[in-house]
Amino acid sequence: GQPHEGQPAPQEGEEAEVVEIPEYFTAKRKSVVTYPADLFEKHTWHDGSPMSVADFVMYLILSLDPGTEGSEIYDASQVGKVESFKSSFKGFNITSTDPLVIEYYSDVWYLDAEYNVTDWWPYYDYGEGPWHMMALGVLAETDEELAFSGDKSEALKVEWLSYISGPSLEILRENLDQALEEDYIPYAATLGKFISAEEAADRYNNLLNWYRIQGHFFVNSGPFYLNKVFPVEKTLTLTRYQDYQDPSGKWDLFGTPMIADLEVDGPGRVKSGEEAVFDAYVTFEDAP
């Protein structure tokens, strides 16, 4: 269903709050994004997990839940951000999963057309995030072991969550063990419609193997993955992701600036008041 005014997804074992929804909403902007039909076949996270609809839904949930009172990961420092978002947010609807089609309704619009497209790609403030990676952070913050924000970490006197280094890693590893043992599906009342127990187990095992090899939990899906982290030296290494779906030469077309050549042909002189015709020829590298 479509969320109404950012109602938080019920936690497992809780009854969903009944909210009276108006017969219809109005919105100043409707964005429809259709993803490639083979998105979930070819696009994988760096730990080998295929991307799924659940990654997008988790992103929507975490756009609202931290700043919503009553949430198990409620963060007072996020209230302003969430309330600002909710003031213009009118709806989110997945009309198809094959291919993935996402409708988004909002009262915020822009003069530049490209900014009016909202894709809901799971990209957080610190980069992309698959649902199973984010789930470890949710578990840790729910138990007040770590906090997603610096403000909350100071308020709770706990470590500011880091997926790449520091004391967070041991805590995240413990939560990964818990997730594996319990077949944990975060926000199960909602995400349980998109995640099976088998998929959850596969994802967590992929993340465990990733951690054993890479030594961190930061999983993305771009052309380079975070290989090694050296926090003392403040350096890191990135390595090409061999299974990235786009060929390396996909954007070669834009390697050379397409500066056109213009030639105008017409009479050299024109008498005032008379009609004149000029032909304009626009070429790039001698081609029209």
Language-model features: locations:
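The feature preferentially marks the first beta-strand/turn patch immediately downstream
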Residues: G1-P288
